[in-house]
UniProtKB/Swiss-Prot annotation:
A Pfam family per the record: FabA
Family: Belongs to the thioester dehydratase family. FabZ subfamily.
Domain of life: Bacteria
Chief location: cytoplasm
Catalytic activity reported: a (3R)-hydroxyacyl-[ACP] = a (2E)-enoyl-[ACP] + H2O
Subcellular location field: Cytoplasm
Keywords of this entry: Cytoplasm, Lipid A biosynthesis, Lipid biosynthesis, Lipid metabolism, Lyase
InterPro entries (UniProt xref): FabA_FabZ, FabZ, HotDog_dom_sf
The protein's name: 3-hydroxyacyl-[acyl-carrier-protein] dehydratase FabZ
Any one cellular-component term (Gene Ontology): cytoplasm
Length: 152
């Protein structure tokens, strides 16, 4: 699939996202991109359902989305920004670090995460940093900075 595949309305379907990111079930954690400003920002949705495998053990009597999966969702949105930058080399950008991540509210089955990532920097065409936030019903549930690195 062509690296530059955003439609005219700057949105991506789940099928198009699968063409950009290597993640597959159960780690494909972005359902749709609803806004994209190339090279700067992406806003995406993750619908959280009780059918997801993590809820069998986290926690059966009070299911909560693990914080690490919220961060991974934000990282995947950041990965979409990086893959859509025309001046960067093609290849696999992997999640390389996090800074200042804060979890503010639980995320429950039935919630819809609205994830916003903004590009902060690109260095030597190999390293990227984004600021990410995840909201549910307009309330901030998680925020932090995420780093990416191009794998040779």
């Amino acid at each position: 699939m062509d690296k530059q595949l955003l439609s005219e309305n700057n949105q991506l379907s789940s099928e198009e996202i699968l063409g950009l990111l290597p993640h597959r079930f159960p780690f494909a954690l972005v359902d749709r991109v609803i806004e994209h400003i190339p090279g700067h920002k992406a806003v995406a949705l993750k619908n959280v359902t009780i059918n997801e495998p993590q809820f069998q053990g986290h926690f059966p009597e009070r299911p909560l989305m693990p914080g690490v999966l919220i961060v991974e969702s934000m990282a995947q949105v950041g990965g979409i920004i990086v893959t859509q930058m025309p001046d960067l080399p093609k290849g696999l950008f992997v999640f390389a670090g996090i800074n200042n991540v804060k979890f503010r509210r639980p995320v429950l089955p039935g919630d819809q995460l609205v994830i916003t990532c903004e590009l902060l920097s690109i260095k030597r065409q190999r390293f990227g940093k984004v600021k990410g936030e995840a909201h549910v019903d307009g309330k901030l549930v998680c925020s932090g900075e995420l780093m990416f690195s191009l794998v040779d």
